[in-house]
């Protein structure tokens, strides 16, 4: 198996606020759609294995206490953390080294109350 994760779905309460937040920090354009009464915002897809979205659904509740996903910071964690603050997020863990082999991570709280991590090799 090449990649263990095939899709990431981030639950949101305020779809427009979350869309603006993630478009700002990731510098992407989110495509909106509705599927089975769920408002979905798809991240751009270059490869099938890099699929992600935000979703607003009554059954999904944003949380900082559950699974932690790591977004690719493209070797610019410091720059992305600045964007997180500008877009209304909160830094929970600043850029931290994961030993000599695994790069760096940081953790933030998004505008919806989700705990999200960033990862980069440098």
Language-model features: locations:
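Residue-level signal for pocket-adjacent positions within structured domains
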Residues: 25, 49, 90-93
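Conserved short beta-strand elements that form part of the metal-binding/catalytic scaffold
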Residues: 29-64, 115-120
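Short alpha-helical
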Residues: 16-17, 38, 49, 75-79
């Amino acid at each position: 198996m090449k990649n263990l994760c095939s899709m990431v779905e981030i639950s949101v309460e305020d779809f427009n606020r979350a869309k603006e937040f993630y478009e700002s920090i990731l510098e992407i354009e989110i495509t909106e759609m509705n599927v089975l009464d769920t408002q979905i915002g798809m991240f751009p897809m270059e490869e099938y294995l890099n699929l992600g979205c935000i979703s607003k659904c009554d059954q999904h509740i944003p949380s900082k206490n559950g699974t932690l996903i790591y977004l690719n910071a493209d070797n610019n964690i410091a720059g992305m953390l600045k964007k997180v603050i500008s877009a209304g997020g909160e830094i929970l863990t600043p850029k931290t080294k994961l030993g000599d082999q695994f790069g760096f991570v940081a953790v933030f709280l998004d505008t919806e109350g989700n705990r999200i991590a960033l990862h980069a090799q440098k």
